[in-house]
Amino acid sequence: MFRVGNGIDFHKLIHEPFRPLVLAGVEIKSEFAFLGHSDADVILHAVADAILGALSLGDIGVHFPDTDPQYKNMKSTRIIEKCLELVAEKKFKLINVDCTYVGDHPKISPIRAELNASLANITKLPLDCVSIKATTSEGMGALGRSEGVMVMATVLIESLKK
């Protein structure tokens, strides 16, 4: 049996030269950062929600509430680690991850290979089983004004139960 999960996440872009801008576990050189309770890794948050959705286990707000101080500035790689533990506990296996990044900053094309490699490493998947694509909102709305970014993620999991 296969299951599909979808996740979506938004983060506001702020001028904060001393806060790291993190995407797919990679710190990107920038004078900007994403506003968030954790490290605000918008890619990993969308992937986590997709995994939790495929497992019918809610979302990251249920498992890692932003009202809990223990999660302040937490690395989002830890969120993915916990999600992968849940995948194993429920006797499933992660098959692939597909992400679409919507935003103007930072540009994904120059760092795509590094982001894909990091996402593959974090999710313990082969490189050809992860994908990060990018587009813009063509200048429309908050995303078009570079006020923030959005990531949509889709995952496929397979049951290991016979």
From Swiss-Prot:
Highest taxon, organism lineage: Bacteria
Record-level GO BP terms: isopentenyl diphosphate biosynthetic process, methylerythritol 4-phosphate pathway; terpenoid biosynthetic process
Cofactor note: Binds 1 divalent metal cation per subunit.
CDD domains: MECDP_synthase
Annotated catalysed reactions: 4-CDP-2-C-methyl-D-erythritol 2-phosphate = 2-C-methyl-D-erythritol 2,4-cyclic diphosphate + CMP
Matches recorded under InterPro entries: MECDP_synthase, MECDP_synthase_CS, MECDP_synthase_sf
Sites where the protein binds a divalent metal cation: 9, 11, 45
A single GO molecular function term of this UniProt record: metal ion binding
UniProt keyword list: Isoprene biosynthesis, Lyase, Metal-binding
Site (Transition state stabilizer): 37, 136
Cofactor section: a divalent metal cation
Pathway membership, UniProt: Isoprenoid biosynthesis; isopentenyl diphosphate biosynthesis via DXP pathway; isopentenyl diphosphate from 1-deoxy-D-xylulose 5-phosphate: step 4/6
Function: Involved in the biosynthesis of isopentenyl diphosphate (IPP) and dimethylallyl diphosphate (DMAPP), two major building blocks of isoprenoid compounds. Catalyzes the conversion of 4-diphosphocytidyl-2-C-methyl-D-erythritol 2-phosphate (CDP-ME2P) to 2-C-methyl-D-erythritol 2,4-cyclodiphosphate (ME-CPP) with a corresponding release of cytidine 5-monophosphate (CMP).
Subunit details: Homotrimer.
HAMAP family linked: IspF
Name used for this protein in its record: 2-C-methyl-D-erythritol 2,4-cyclodiphosphate synthase
Organism: Leptospira biflexa serovar Patoc (strain Patoc 1 / ATCC 23582 / Paris)
Gene that this polypeptide is encoded by: ispF
